[in-house]
A protein has these predicted regions:
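Bacterial N-terminal signal peptides that target proteins for export
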Residues: 1-8
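Hydrophobic h-region of N-terminal signal peptides that target proteins for export
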Residues: 12-21
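Hydrophobic/aromatic-lined pockets within catalytic cores
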Residues: 17, 93, 195
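N-terminal module-boundary/linker segments of secreted carbohydrate-active enzymes
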Residues: 23-69
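Active-site acidic/histidine clusters and adjacent loop/turn architecture
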Residues: 51-116
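Structured loops at beta-to-helix junctions and adjacent beta-edge loops in soluble globular domains
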Residues: 62-64, 127, 149
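Active-site-adjacent loop/helix surface patches within enzyme catalytic domains
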Residues: 103-142, 151-153
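Catalytic cores and adjacent binding grooves of peptidoglycan-active enzymes
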Residues: 129-131, 135, 140-212
Length: 212
């Protein structure tokens, strides 16, 4: 092979690798940076939080919006699931799986209802289970909610829907875009990584929810 041919072949493989390289560069796991922790203090990381900051990780991802645009997303989670989330969101990005937005719940003052109504995908929030004294898996950074407006928590035989704005999506017999179901790629990926899906619960159904 001549020198020009070798150069052209090398250039071809370099250009071929650029999309994958750019994709990898959009994904990372790190300890929670000081600037991010300042955003969390008094919001998702409340006074009396029992999870040490050192146990949390800051995950940056890329995702496709509902309109097909590529956006950056950020997640704070427990270190135990950080690599799982990184791999899952890489697969979802490769599949062009639509996610409305992925922002820290601190952008909504750690108000779970506001975050869900905005269809925001989020993870860590030190709080108790609604109507209970038990800590939520979100409080440990071991649960994440995906496209929550389209995939609400449905209980009391459908009488209670959370968020209330998601009532139109409570009847899962209907077919509509962005519905999480057993055959959905997102559900399959989370289950493959050992997560439990709230859509499999017996007495209530939390279709947005994945926990480990």
């Amino acid at each position: 092979m001549t020198m020009p041919q070798t150069f052209l072949l090398s250039l071809f493989f370099f250009l071929l690798s650029l999309p994958m390289q750019a994709q990898r560069e959009g994904f990372s796991v790190s300890p929670v940076p000081d600037a991010v922790f300042q955003r969390m203090k008094g919001k998702s990381y409340k006074s009396g939080c029992t999870v040490p900051r050192s146990e949390l990780r800051y995950v940056r991802v890329l995702h496709h919006t509902l309109e097909g645009k590529v956006k950056h997303g950020e997640i704070v989670c427990h270190r135990r699931i950080a690599n799982d989330l990184l791999e899952i969101f890489q697969e979802l990005f490769r599949a062009r799986y639509p996610i409305a937005q992925i922002r820290l719940i601190d952008d909504f003052d750690a108000d779970d209802t506001r975050s869900m109504e905005a269809n925001n995908t989020s993870c860590f929030n030190f709080r108790r289970v609604k109507g209970s004294r038990s800590l939520s898996k979100h409080a440990l950074g071991l649960a994440i909610d995906i496209n929550p407006l389209f995939n609400p928590h449905v209980s009391q035989g459908g009488a209670r829907v959370n968020p209330a704005a998601g009532r139109a999506y409570a009847d899962r017999r209907k077919d509509f875009p962005h519905k999480l179901s057993a055959s959905d790629l997102c559900v399959k990926l989370f289950k493959a990584h050992g997560f439990r899906w709230g859509g499999d619960w017996r007495h209530s159904k939390d279709y947005q929810h994945f926990e480990k």
